[in-house]
Amino acid sequence: MKVSTHHFLPSLLVALWSWATVAQAATHTFNWTTGWGNYNVDGNFERPVITCNGEFPWPDLKVKRGDRIQVYLTNGFDDRNTSLHFHGLSQNGTNMMDGPEMITQCPIAPGDTMLYNFTIDDNDGTYWYHSHTGGQYQDGMKGTLVVEPEDSLPFDYDEEVVVQLAEWYYDNVDTLDRKFMNVYNPTGAEPIPQNLIINNTRNMTWNVEPDTTYLLRIVNTGGFVSQYFWIEDHDMTVVEVDGVYVEKNTTSMLYITVAQRYSVLIHTKNDTSKNYAIMQKFDDTMLDVIPNDLMLNATSYMMYDKDGEKPEQSYVDSIDDFLDDFYLTPLDKVELYEDPDYTITVDVVMDNLKNGVNYAFFNNLTFTAPKVPTLMTALSAGKDALNPLVYGTNTNAFVLKKDEIIEIVLNNNDTGKHPFHLHGHIFQLVDRERGYDDAIGEGPHPFDPEDHNPFPDYPMMRDTVYVNPQSSIVLRFKADNPGVWFFHCHIEWHLKQGLALLLIEAPEEMQNTESQQLTDNHKQVCENVGLSWEGNAAGNTNDFLDLVGQNVQVANIPDGFTAKGIVAMTFSCLAGVLGLISLSTYGLMGVKKSEEEIIRDLGMDPDAVEKVDVSDINSDEDSSRTSKNIE
């Protein structure tokens, strides 16, 4: 039999290449147990933090694209559930490993263990991981993740440094939650942090070599405040944002919201005679109040001479000179996605419900978690999975068709900035309007499809982006990753308030894909926490359109007056009228004073003075008590 080398050699090369790829791919296995320990993060105050195997901080990870990650996460807490999310990874084909509780998994009960097992097939760059339960990452349950490309990076550097930024609270999240989601905080004012930290400390020292190019991977792992970041007398060249390599863009300052990542190149000077300040600054426009003892800046040290003096803090002429990421261009120049097949328009509002607590809303709905994780509803609902109703009336669920171009128009009617994150995708930011100010008669300004800025030919792409106050953003992405994907504000306080929605992408394909099926471990985790892994948002498996018993948001404050309000107003008015009558009646009555009272008022001895007729004094209100001569 004659073998055609024309077909055989390419096949052999493909086989060898595939074998080499498999051979080079590694499996990274981690066994982590959560717990509590005391730690003084900023050098000023010791407080409980969440530990990993009794240690703090949590480990920073570095893997290569194509590698497999296996994390056995054991819940070592006594009194709370937990979960884990790898922020920015697409989890293509492994949606159940994404991590947000009640979205793609049941929460992990105390004493239970869940295996996160996935291959990083289509991501490289700078990422991070964190708990997706109750703001636990604000208590320290988080770390960075660097995914190296299979080939070389599209830029040169000598050394790599990971820089983790965050704000820090002295109270733990449980305490802050009780004060925040409370009738005594009706405006929804977010808790004010006590400090800015960098790499889980304050006033970090970074020893550098002269004439060296450093790659800084900068991650804001905080839960609230955006930060300005700059290094005294050093430019930064941006080369990557959120796992997307971009054309080089040089700046002196970055503006980094929570959950965003920037990779920058910094080339050090030849002169080692001076050390330089590394600066962080709160975006104080996000703070409702600024306490007198809050330091808005934090200074760390870039040391050319480790024995030299540490630098003083560095000032800038304007805080507005930061890089605008809207104008970054992806290195692979992905063209603007064509006109969308489906546009989702959502309006952001912050308001109070009937219980007096302040909530956040998309289109007048505040996200309320279902009784069954949404992914499990999508997998068990059959053809009903195409009906958004099965996912609940308070989850803001949208069902997407495979490979459609999706557009999200987000109108921010709030007076603050919001960083929004989309799980499972990177998106194009095709429009972001400037912020508007009610104080000068502006805003809010919703997006106008007939009157907007020209869309860029090659829009910036990332997975976390901010919207300005009382303004709008427009995002586009391709629905090419079947799964249930969370879209939410990454300010943890706003997520607690319900600023989130769900995108259920090609559920029928998920049902027919082997890698998307629940593992036995997933099912056991649900059973151990007392939850079902089948059913609609109400837990109903007989009729997926029957939502009786589902979780719903607190009732709205009713229009007009309730019966109690009418009664209260009636008696208040009656009390007011009676009060006016009393004032009028007693105010018009003459109040006679005795002679002795008048004399004592004048500071005289009653026994030493001649008795006089005081009727004239009592009858003349304007008379001075010293106007009569008493002899």
Curated annotation (Swiss-Prot):
Binding site for Cu cation 3: 132, 423, 488
Extracellular side: 26-564
Signal peptide residue numbers: 1-25
InterPro entries: Cu-oxidase-like_N (IPR011707), Cu-oxidase_2nd (IPR001117), Cu-oxidase_C (IPR011706), Cu-oxidase_fam (IPR045087), Cu_oxidase_CS (IPR033138), Cu_oxidase_Cu_BS (IPR002355), Cupredoxin (IPR008972), CuRO_2_Fet3-like (IPR044130)
Residues the entry annotates as binding Cu cation 4: 418, 489, 494
A Pfam family matched in the record: Cu-oxidase_2
SUPFAM superfamilies in UniProt: Cupredoxins
TM region(s), chain numbering: 565-585
Protein residues bound to Cu cation 1: 85, 421
Annotated region described as Disordered, given as residue ranges: 610-631
One GO CC term on file: high-affinity iron permease complex
Sequence positions that bind Cu cation 2: 87, 130, 490
Compositionally skewed regions (Basic and acidic residues) per UniProt: 622-631
Cofactor: Cu cation
Annotated glycan sites: 31, 81, 92, 117, 199, 203, 249, 270, 297, 364, 413
UniProt topology in membrane: Single-pass type I membrane protein
Positions of the Plastocyanin-like domain: 50-148, 195-297, 387-506
Biological process per Gene Ontology, one example term: reductive iron assimilation
UniProt record similarity statement: Belongs to the multicopper oxidase family.
Protein role: Iron transport multicopper ferroxidase required for Fe(2+) high affinity uptake. Required to oxidize Fe(2+) and release it from the transporter. Essential component of copper-dependent iron transport.
Descriptive protein name: Iron transport multicopper oxidase FET3
Gene name per UniProt: FET3
